[in-house]
From Swiss-Prot:
<keyword id="KW-0813">Transport</keyword>
<keyword id="KW-0157">Chromophore</keyword>
<keyword id="KW-0249">Electron transport</keyword>
<dbReference type="GO" id="GO:0033115">
    <property type="term" value="C:cyanelle thylakoid membrane"/>
</dbReference>
<dbReference type="GO" id="GO:0015979">
    <property type="term" value="P:photosynthesis"/>
</dbReference>
<dbReference type="Pfam" id="PF00502">
    <property type="entry name" value="Phycobilisome"/>
</dbReference>
<dbReference type="InterPro" id="IPR006247">
    <property type="entry name" value="Phycocyanin_b"/>
</dbReference>
<feature type="binding site" description="covalent">
    <location>
        <position position="82"/>
    </location>
    <ligand>
        <name>(2R,3E)-phycocyanobilin 1</name>
    </ligand>
</feature>
<keyword id="KW-0488">Methylation</keyword>
<dbReference type="InterPro" id="IPR012128">
    <property type="entry name" value="Phycobilisome_asu/bsu"/>
</dbReference>
<feature type="binding site" description="covalent">
    <location>
        <position position="153"/>
    </location>
    <ligand>
        <name>(2R,3E)-phycocyanobilin 2</name>
    </ligand>
</feature>
<protein>
    <recommendedName>
        <fullName>C-phycocyanin beta chain</fullName>
    </recommendedName>
</protein>
<dbReference type="InterPro" id="IPR038719">
    <property type="entry name" value="Phycobilisome_asu/bsu_sf"/>
</dbReference>
<keyword id="KW-0472">Membrane</keyword>
<keyword id="KW-0194">Cyanelle</keyword>
<keyword id="KW-0602">Photosynthesis</keyword>
<dbReference type="InterPro" id="IPR009050">
    <property type="entry name" value="Globin-like_sf"/>
</dbReference>
Amino acid sequence: MLDAFGKVVAQADARGEFISSAQFDALSKLASEGNKRLDAVQGITASAATIVSSAARSLFAEQPQLIAPGGNAYTNRRVAACLRDLEIVLRYITYATLAGDSSVLDDRCLNGLRETYQALGVPGSSVAVAIQKMKDAAVSVVNDPSGVTVGDCSALASEVASYFDRAAAAVV
């Protein structure tokens, strides 16, 4: 896992070059907006239980067959496993947001997840719907102006949304 800074250094080192001015500018921007990033991660983390439970509740309301007898989330144990998995995805998205790079999400959470779900008979499309619901809630947290560093958070909100999109695509 590399953060955005480590990745730039590794790339420049592999090429045997100094860090380019464009790379330096991108890292400088990332550093200058660090407080927004910290505020976003703190907000998502503080709201994590609500984000996860609301996404699951909404998914089960839209797809009641999942919690009906014979459904993939039938029994409390399976619902708990669903909530746990959604929480893990959300947690790794906060790590990626903090690092400014998706590699931790990809390497430690998403790689092999589709195959695992297929082997267990978990409907990936339903998981993707729940992840999209979490995305909507998390992006709302990022865009909430209360208690965050003043400034435009649209680029950061787009970045956070892209991590959710990446996770949703990984399970279908």
